[in-house]
Amino acid sequence: GLLDSLKNLAINAAKGAGQSVLNTLSCKLSKTC
């Protein structure tokens, strides 16, 4: 349904945001950016 679609969108957005934050943190820590 629509709610499931919205839920999946929110989950994917959260995953994407979390992934980019993790990438930024790890590159800052290892000074590779």
Swiss-Prot record:
UniProt key word Disulfide bond: yes
Pfam families: Antimicrobial_2
Annotated compartments: Secreted
Main location class: secreted
SS bonds (residue pairs): C27-C33
UniProt keyword annotations, A-Z: Amphibian defense peptide, Antibiotic, Antimicrobial, Disulfide bond, Secreted
Tissue specificity remark: Expressed by the skin glands.
Entry's family note: Belongs to the frog skin active peptide (FSAP) family. Brevinin subfamily.
Role according to the record: Has antibacterial activity against the Gram-positive bacterium S.aureus ATCC 25923 (MIC=18 uM) and the Gram-negative bacterium E.coli ATCC 25726 (MIC=36 uM).
Name used for this protein in its record: Brevinin-2HSa
Naturally occurring in which organism (per UniProt): Odorrana hosii
